[in-house]
Amino acid sequence: MQTEELLSPPQTPWWNAFGSQPLTTESLSGEASDSFTGVKAVTTEAEQGVVDKQTSTTLFTFSPGGEKSSRDVPKPHVAFAMQSACFEFGFAQPMMYTKHPHVEQYYGVVSAYGSQRSSGRVMIPLKMETEEDGTIYVNSKQYHGIIRRRQSRAKAEKLSRCRKPYMHHSRHLHAMRRPRGSGGRFLNTKTADAAKQSKPSNSQSSEVFHPENETINSSREANESNLSDSAVTSMDYFLSSSAYSPGGMVMPIKWNAAAMDIGCCKLNI
């Protein structure tokens, strides 16, 4: 019976298994109904000066009877270690558990609602400072695109700065009065005015040359009048023979009158 009592687990509350409430000698000695009546703390490496930064362990030995009986008679005892399941950084309240992110801060049980303290990883901003010479390293495939976009932005900013934001109303009215072409662009009035001035000069030159044309026409008429007598007589013979011969061609009188009026040939009838 004595060995069974020694090997039986300690009767401790179930919420102490999470390690949020540390065990003390007063709490263990106050439970008279339990089979363990004495508690003896064993010094560990943490008490000797070697302290682990992440976890700390404390060993407790439980033996039946008082402390005197345990010292006098060596009896088998059960030793177990209670390791805190939380990280301790020197704060008064325990930190969150790694396995259970949503844990009650005071009772050590998994809460039904999410905790206010987030356990996700913190996004650290990248180092935005450039090198001393101001160079920025980019991907080789994106270099040309970046340069092209920078040039287009610089060009757009330059145009927006040079252009005046307001145009006077008189300039707008003047633009509305200017003649436009089929495409909507303004016509060049200087070339149109030059074309208009060239047309009267051409007409004057043609008028100047009219007397010369008259002299040329008169010389042509003189040349036509100076035909040889033989040609005239031959024509007279041809006309007379064709007009009076019964089988020959008869030339109408109207044609003769028209030919005489034109002056292409002068006939002596």
Swiss-Prot record:
Function: Stimulates the transcription of various genes by recognizing and binding to a CCAAT motif in promoters.
Keyword Secreted appears in the UniProt entry: no
Subunit-level organization: Heterotrimeric transcription factor composed of three components, NF-YA, NF-YB and NF-YC. NF-YB and NF-YC must interact and dimerize for NF-YA association and DNA binding.
Motif Subunit association domain (SAD), chain ranges: 137-158
Region (Disordered): 168-227
Organism per entry: Arabidopsis thaliana
SMART domains cross-referenced by the UniProt entry: CBF (SM00521)
Residues of the DNA-binding region: 164-189
Bias (Basic residues): 168-180
Keyword Lyase belongs to the record: no
Family listed: Belongs to the NFYA/HAP2 subunit family.
Designated name of the protein: Nuclear transcription factor Y subunit A-10
Biased composition (Polar residues): 198-207, 214-227
GO molecular function: DNA binding; DNA-binding transcription factor activity
Gene name as annotated: NFYA10
Swiss-Prot/TrEMBL keywords: Activator, DNA-binding, Nucleus, Transcription, Transcription regulation
GO CC terms: CCAAT-binding factor complex
Chief location: nucleus
Subcellular location: Nucleus
